[in-house]
Amino acid sequence: MQREFVSGAGLGLRRALLEPLGAGDGVRVDFLEVAPENWIGIGGRLGRQFRELTERLPFLCHGLSLNLGGYAPLDMSLLRAIKGFIEQHDIRAYSEHLSACADDGQLYDLMPLPFSDESVRRVAERVRVVQDVLERPLIVENVSAYARLPGELEEVDFVRAVLEEADCQLLLDVNNVYVNACNFGFDAHAYIAAMPSRRIAYLHMAGHDEQGASLKIDTHGAPVCDPVWELLAHAYACHGERPTLLERDFNLPPLSELYAETDRIRELQRRSGEAQLRSLGYGT
């Protein structure tokens, strides 16, 4: 039986965080997220520590290698392994990137897709296959990019079309919207507002690297910047408060600094909830 979804503020789990999160009784996040490829088959001490956390907190999976946008056949053995991992650890939901990451072999990067009607149909068909195998909805994530491939659609229209054609949900990565808006010159606020509220499952927040005024690189290696915090508040204003997760992949600070950012997420969620109540005529 599929469990209820997560709520509140979450954190991406990295191996360096296993011991800090496992120490003591208080974990100050509401849920955690892992890349299943990094944890499938892990045993020993790390496996035991991971299992202890999955028994204490709700978990989400965020995949890296499924190659939803590629032309190579889907890796069914990987997909079956992910399904087993999800069932073993009572994972609440599984998401993947709207990108290509393999050809004859793994590319170890998330490559952009052509924003075309043909690409919409192909990706949607692969999403439906994944959902059939997993026997659960798939959540797809908008990705950062540094080049554009030929296509007749804008990014926002491509993402919306995939969601409708595949009948799937969205992981709205707010930092990726900001990075792409800076890199390609579109309106980040309009992009977020255009996403279909009923499709948004949860949100991602992260930091990025500044490569001059016109190039941003999504690194997950820095604190979230003020413009991205403002976009998160805008997302809540447009779509209501949603579960939101902080990603930090390297340059890991003390856990207290990560908690300060997840606390800021909670504060924005609280303000969004209060604003919604006021709009309905409750409160002052």
From Swiss-Prot:
**One Pfam family named in its UniProt record:** MbnB_TglH_ChrH
Question: Which family is annotated?
Answer: Belongs to the UPF0276 family.
UniProt-listed HAMAP family = UPF0276
Q: What is this protein called?
A: UPF0276 protein PA3283
* Gene3D superfamilies cross-referenced by the UniProt entry: Divalent-metal-dependent TIM barrel enzymes (3.20.20.150)
| Domain of life of the native organism | Bacteria
Q: Which organism is it from?
A: Pseudomonas aeruginosa (strain ATCC 15692 / DSM 22644 / CIP 104116 / JCM 14847 / LMG 12228 / 1C / PRS 101 / PAO1)
Locate the transmembrane regions by residue number: none
